[in-house]
UniProtKB/Swiss-Prot annotation:
Belongs to the cationic peptide 04 (cupiennin) family. 01 subfamily. The modification Glutamic acid 1-amide is found at residue 35. One of its GO terms (cellular component) is extracellular region. One of its GO terms (biological process) is defense response to bacterium. Its main location: secreted. Expressed by the venom gland. It comes from Cupiennius salei (American wandering spider). This is Cupiennin-1b. Has antimicrobial activity against E.coli, E.faecalis, P.aeruginosa, and S.aureus. Has insecticidal and hemolytic activities. Probably acts by disturbing membrane function with its amphipathic structure. It is found in: Secreted. GO terms for molecular function: toxin activity.
Length: 35
């Protein structure tokens, strides 16, 4: 039903957000190391 579809989408979004956050975090750490 609708609930399972919503859960599926939420999982996908969470994964994408986590990936983006990891990228941003790595960039931030790299910049800090450069200083």
């Amino acid at each position: 039903g609708f609930g399972s579809l919503f859960k599926f989408l939420a999982k996908k979004v969470a994964k994408t957000v986590a990936k983006q956050a990891a990228k941003q975090g790595a960039k931030y750490i790299a910049n800090k190391q450069m200083e």
